[in-house]
Structure formats: C-alpha cells, structure tokens
C-alpha cells in the first residue's frame, strides 16, 4: 500500500489559520484558530494497513485546533462533537472508535476481542497522530503557545497517553528559549530546566555556557516529570557540575 511505503517523515502534515465568522444575538462574532493536521505513522498506520483490520476502516488522520487570542480547548470531535472533556487546552479531531451511545471515546484495558482492538486503536491514534499534530502546533505558534502545553493530567487513560506522547514528541523540537548566545530556540532534551525563581543560579550557569531555560512552575514540573528535558537546575545538578 502507498501509505505503508511512504517514509514516516514524508507523511502529509498541514498547518493553517482558520477564521470563522458567525452571527450571535444580532452581531457578527469572529474567532480565529490555528489548526495542525497530519497522517501519522507508528502503530496507528500499522493497524490501519493490516488486512485483518480492513473491516474497521481505521484511518490514521487527526488534527488539533487552538483558538487564538482567547481561552478554549478541551473538546473532542469525530467530525461531530463528542461530549467528553479531554483536559487538553486544544480541541482534538480524529477517526476515533466511540462507545455504543457515542458519548465517549472507547477505552478499557480489561477487554478482549473487538472491544480491546477499538481501545488500542484510539490510543494509537492519540499517540501516533494527534500527539504529532499537537507538537507541531506548539512549534508553529512559538511564544504564543505558552498556554497550550498539556499540563492537566487525570482526564482518563486515553488522554493521559496523548499527553505523555506530546511530551515525547516535544523533546526533539526547538520549543523552548534559552538566553544563551543572546537568545535562541532549543530542544527540551538539550536544555537545563530552571524555575523562574532560580534567577541567580540560572545566570551563573549561563555564564558557564549551559543552555538554561527559565520556566513557569507548572510547565517546569510537567517537563521534568515527563523526562522531557536534558537536566533540571537543582542543588544536586549544580554540585555535580562544579565537582
């Protein structure tokens, strides 16, 4: 199949700004969204192309959308809205397998047969497709993406898996900024993550030409917990560096 033969790095990806105008209470309201969409690889592509899964019509395509200039997100769509909260600060759309009442994304680890397959598909779609689109959206928005990192955990197994996969994807992308060399973008895996209040220590390490990145507490905690950063600016790290 052409999909299987395409190198993963060459699979279709698209970024777009979408403006929506609608009438509300006699006035025209305008909302703008940044939208990232892609066809994914990994387990999602393998499942979609497996002959034994042909009847399920799995499609490894998904997208995420972030409203620009206003808070939003947390909604899930399978082209039509699904009444489930994802805990993510972006909206998510994909070819998900839904529960029988179409009110939730199918999930569960204690299933067998078709139910287990549906659950595995949803996780693969979130990890190999949605998370890739999400990380690329963060990269495209640059500084404007500060409030779009997936910091909230506990929305459910599927969404926690997606959240973890976003940090995995983010590790290798220049999403953070260090003051080293006058300021430049850097991949999380190469940085020393400091809290905003670590000013004096961070400045000292910058003088030693370490790529220190100052982060807000919630993002710092999430990046460190996900093992996304190269090192954490801590007394232990500083002692080890100078000894």
Segments from the language model and where they lie:
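GHKL/Bergerat-fold ATPase module
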Residues: 1-243
């Amino acid at each position: 199949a052409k999909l299987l033969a395409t190198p993963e790095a060459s699979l279709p990806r698209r970024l777009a700004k979408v403006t929506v105008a609608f009438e509300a209470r006699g006035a025209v309201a305008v909302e703008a969204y940044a939208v990232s969409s892609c066809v994914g690889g990994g387990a999602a592509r393998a499942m979609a192309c497996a002959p034994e899964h042909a009847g399920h019509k799995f499609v490894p395509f998904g997208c995420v959308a972030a409203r620009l200039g206003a808070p939003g997100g947390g909604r899930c769509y399978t082209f039509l809205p699904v009444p489930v909260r994802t805990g993510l600060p972006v909206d998510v759309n994909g070819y998900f397998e839904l529960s029988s009442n179409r009110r939730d994304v199918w999930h569960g680890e204690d299933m067998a047969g078709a139910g287990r397959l549906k659950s595995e598909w949803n996780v693969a779609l979130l990890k190999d497709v949605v998370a890739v689109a999400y990380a690329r959206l963060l990269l495209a928005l640059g500084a404007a993406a500060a409030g779009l990192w997936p910091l909230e955990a506990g929305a459910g197994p599927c969404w926690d898996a997606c959240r973890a996969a976003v940090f995995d994807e983010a590790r290798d992308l220049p999403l953070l900024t260090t003051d080293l060399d006058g300021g430049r973008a850097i991949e999380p895996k190469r940085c020393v993550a400091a809290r905003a209040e670590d000013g004096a220590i961070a400045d000292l390490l910058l003088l030693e030409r370490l790529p220190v990145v100052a982060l807000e507490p919630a993002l710092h905690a999430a990046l460190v917990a996900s093992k996304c950063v190269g090192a954490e600016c801590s007394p232990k790290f500083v002692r080890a560096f100078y000894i």
